[in-house]
Structures are given as structure tokens and as C-alpha cells.
Amino acid sequence: MFILKLFVYTVVIFFVSLFIFGFLSNDPRRNPEPEED
């Protein structure tokens, strides 16, 4: 059961990370200039 739970959490975190990364990358409010911190 621990293996299954670990696998599920890994998949969930993976998809959430992809979603957040894609959302931030496609956010029109961000300036295209990479020098902005």
C-alpha cells in the first residue's frame, strides 16, 4: 500500500508541477524580459 501511495503522490506532484510551469510560462502578465527579478 505504501508503494501505491508513493506512486500516486509522485504522479500527482508531477502533473501539478507541469500545470504550474505551463501556467507561469503562458501567463500574459509576465514581461518577456529575462532580466526582471
UniProtKB/Swiss-Prot annotation:
Can you say where in the cell this protein is located? Plastid membrane
SUPFAM superfamilies found in the cross-reference section: Photosystem II reaction center protein I, PsbI
One Pfam family this sequence matches: PsbI
GO CC terms, sorted: photosystem II reaction center; plastid membrane; thylakoid membrane
Q: Which UniProt keywords apply?
A: Membrane, Photosynthesis, Photosystem II, Plastid, Reaction center, Transmembrane, Transmembrane helix
Q: Does the keyword Metal-binding apply?
A: no
Question: Which membrane topology term applies here?
Answer: Single-pass membrane protein
Under the heading InterPro entries, the entry gives:
PSII_PsbI, PSII_PsbI_sf
Q: Organism's domain of life? A: Eukaryota
Main localisation, per the record?
plastid
Q: Which GO terms describe its biological process?
A: photosynthesis
Q: Where are the transmembrane segments?
A: 1-21
Membership in a protein family: Belongs to the PsbI family.
* Subunit-structure text: PSII is composed of 1 copy each of membrane proteins PsbA, PsbB, PsbC, PsbD, PsbE, PsbF, PsbH, PsbI, PsbJ, PsbK, PsbL, PsbM, PsbT, PsbX, PsbY, PsbZ, Psb30/Ycf12, at least 3 peripheral proteins of the oxygen-evolving complex and a large number of cofactors. It forms dimeric complexes.
Question: What is the protein's known function?
Answer: One of the components of the core complex of photosystem II (PSII), required for its stability and/or assembly. PSII is a light-driven water:plastoquinone oxidoreductase that uses light energy to abstract electrons from H(2)O, generating O(2) and a proton gradient subsequently used for ATP formation. It consists of a core antenna complex that captures photons, and an electron transfer chain that converts photonic excitation into a charge separation.
State the protein's name. Photosystem II reaction center protein I
Q: Which organism is it from?
A: Cuscuta gronovii (Common dodder)
Q: Taxonomic lineage per UniProt?
A: Eukaryota, Viridiplantae, Streptophyta, Embryophyta, Tracheophyta
This chain is encoded by the gene named psbI
